[in-house]
Amino acid sequence: DPVGHVNNNAYGLFIENARTVLFMDVENKIKSELDSSSKCDWVLRKLDIDFLREIHYPGEVDVGIAITRIGTSSMVVNHGVFTSGYCAATAVGISVYFDLETRSSTPIPEKIQQAMLK
């Protein structure tokens, strides 16, 4: 960007990508145990990013992710964005399990809850 570092919007993309990969990996591992007729997915309700240091381009970015709380229909996910040996940002997100037909939150199936905690 004009300031000479990775724009703050890119941090959100790094975080979203890590969260999406986690959710896909977990659901793929237990796919055979899930109701195949279910039309549910995850939506982001809230994302709070604390920008700690700049990220310069080009470079590599790693995102660490940890589920810190699972509720009935949502979970809290903590993230750390790392580059060049330091933490550039931390973030806390709330993801909601969302019924694509009713367009509303729905309870997270127990199988998914258990798999997310492993």
Listing of model-derived features with the role each one plays in the protein:
Residues 1-62, 68-118:
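Terminal targeting signals and extreme-terminal segments of soluble enzymes
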